[in-house]
Amino acid sequence: MFRKIAAAVSAAILSVSLASCSMTEKSVTEVVNNTEVPPKMLFLGDSIAAGYGLEGYTADDNYHCRSYSNILREKYNEELRGKCGHTMVNKAVSGATSSDLIGQIQSGQLDSDLADCDAIVVSIGGNDLLGIMLDLFNSMGISESGSFNKDNFDFFSAASMFLSINSDVDKALDQFELNIKTIAEELDGRTEGTVYIQTLYDPLEYYSKFKRVTDFSDEKIGRLNEIITENSACGYKVIDIAADFEGKAGSLTNIADLDIHPNAKGHEVIAEDVDAAFRATGFTYTTTVYGDRQLSAEGRIVIGGIIAAIAFLAVVGAALLLRKKKDN
């Protein structure tokens, strides 16, 4: 009988060694790492974010111009190399208004990018006022080609136009305030990432000789930026681009050519502002760390059974030896 028990134990030990792969496992630990910049960032909004006017920009390609999103992509690819890597997605659409952005978000086409995004940067609002402002430009004798005949400038027509479009601009701003709240709400329901909304710089400050123009744009664009700032409690952080462009429209935009968009230098300034906002926030990413191989739960059960069997074998063996001595 002792030999049978010993054989059974030996067989059990053999089976454990044959099944050693399932008897052991490596411990797995998820480690949260801190980083100053986002592993994945998404840019939304209008032509400013798209990079309109820069060399390499096309209407269907936001990735081959030196826009602020691409400047940061290059920077973060290097900074996060060998760590978690970096991904930049730019879904900005030139000409988009705040209503257009709402439609884009609600369509669901951004859901997959929003779901795993760490930072979402939005540039929106300029086109909400652009059409109205262009009417004003036309009334001043500024053509679509960018020419401006000062000799034929009609001050009275311009003044009349200011009065007539003022209410239109105010209505557009009222709608923008409703839209910015909707944008924040829609994004909040689709992402765990941090949302940032940029303020809008005032390119019309360039026309400093025409105080009525600069006063009007300062008031209306200033109000738009107040709306952005005052509604940040809806769930986003504000990146104050306007502050760093103030007094520099001539050097940071193409307004001298009747193009309100940032030039290459302007995009570098925006990139610095966005980068500073990211670093003030901070982000995390998770890595998996594997420890030394150890017994799995199944292995502990089996080994426990074998130990019990060996102990039982020892007891039986001792009893048999004792009985044998008594028989002798």
Spans of features found by a protein language model:
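Structural recognition of the beta-strand scaffold that forms the well-ordered cores
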Residues: 40-45, 49-51, 87-92, 118-123, ...
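Serine-esterase "nucleophile elbow" of acetyl-processing enzymes
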Residues: 22-92, 110-112, 140, 263
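Catalytic His-Asp segment of secreted/periplasmic serine-dependent ester chemistry enzymes
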Residues: 200-295, 310
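Oxyanion-hole/transition-state-stabilizing segment in secreted/luminal serine hydrolases
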Residues: 100-171, 202
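Active-site segments of SGNH/GDSL-like serine hydrolases
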Residues: 164, 181-218
